A protein has these predicted regions:
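Residues that define the transmembrane beta-barrel architecture of outer-membrane proteins
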Residues: 24-28, 81-87, 138-142, 181-185, ...
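Repeated loop/turn-to-beta-strand initiation elements of outer-membrane beta-barrel proteins
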Residues: 38-42, 98-100, 152-156, 195-201
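Surface-exposed extracellular loop regions of Gram-negative outer-membrane beta-barrel proteins
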Residues: 1-28, 46-74, 163-172, 206-220
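Residues on the lipid-exposed face of transmembrane beta-strands in outer-membrane beta-barrel proteins
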Residues: 30-34, 46, 87-93, 109, ...
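Gram-negative outer-membrane beta-barrel transporters
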Residues: 48-50, 69-166
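Surface-exposed loop and edge beta-strand positions of immunoglobulin-like domains
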Residues: 21-23, 33, 47, 80, ...
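Outer-membrane beta-barrel domain signature
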Residues: 17-21, 76-80, 100, 129-133, ...
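C-terminal beta-signal and adjacent terminal beta-strands/loops
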Residues: 52, 105, 161-169, 190-241
């Protein structure tokens, strides 16, 4: 018997699916790396994935269960098969090639492009839809970090980006839920000293851009949920005996 979770405050129900098939993935990766004489490397790669019977949450409205009607019904289902092809790039290097004094300063960055397409889509009423992206697969992902490391002092400024992607699939494209694109920026600092009792003072500030958690339904102008958390600051001291 499948699990049943009822959220009465929102009149929502989630039911498990004992008929789920395991997801199977066939992967191919090819990459090339070049290492600089000083610390650092540049890397480029391509990949291909064939995924069979991927699982995604299907959402329906006005669902009846044991005499009650729920406004939102969620159940995981095998949605079909998918093909993913993409490119991965990464670069890491300190700045000593500019001047020896800049050896303590460096940069690290990655970028991933993924093109995904669903085949044999088997949601009832949507079998003939084409050009669907695989749920949970953003097209663009990028990360970058600028750092300073000298002695016990470490400073780092980081940036992360991911484009929007399908999170849940509904009865039609109108009801598909998307996780909106995100831009995160964080800064971290720490200083470590001592030999017998190694002590580290640290501080960090996350979400400097006040990036919200946002979902939209169908099209970007139809906000489904938006939550702002502001900047989170954390500081402290660690002592190793």
């Amino acid at each position: 018997m499948p699990s049943v979770n009822i959220k009465r405050s929102d009149n929502e129900i989630t039911i498990g699916n004992p008929e789920l098939k395991p997801t199977v993935s066939y992967n191919f990766d090819l990459s090339a790396d070049y290492y600089f004489r000083s610390i650092g490397l540049i890397s480029a790669g391509i990949f291909y994935k064939k995924i069979d019977d991927f699982i995604v949450d299907q959402v329906s409205t006005n669902y009846e269960y044991q005499g009650n009607t729920y406004t939102r019904f969620t159940q995981p289902k095998n949605a079909g098969n998918a093909n993913l092809v993409g490119v991965e790039l990464s670069y890491q290097r300190d700045f000593s090639f500019i001047a020896p004094a800049l050896k303590c300063v460096g940069f690290y960055g990655t970028y991933t492009y993924t093109h995904s397409r669903v085949e044999d889509f088997n949601f009832e009423g949507r079998e003939n839809e084409k050009d669907l992206s695989m749920p949970g697969s953003p097209e663009h992902i990028a990360n970058a970090s600028l750092y300073f490391e000298k002695g016990g002092l470490n400073l780092r400024l980081s940036y992360n980006f991911a484009s929007d992607f399908i999170d849940e699939m509904g009865e039609s494209t109108f009801y598909d839920r998307y996780y909106d694109k995100v831009n995160y920026m964080d800064v971290n600092a720490s200083y470590t000293f001592g030999k017998k009792f190694k002590t580290t003072f640290y501080a960090e500030a996350n979400n400097l851009l006040n990036q919200p958690l946002r979902y939209y339904q169908g099209t970007k102008d139809r906000t489904m949920q938006a939550e702002y958390y502001g900047v989170k600051v954390n500081a402290g001291v660690k002592i190793n005996f």
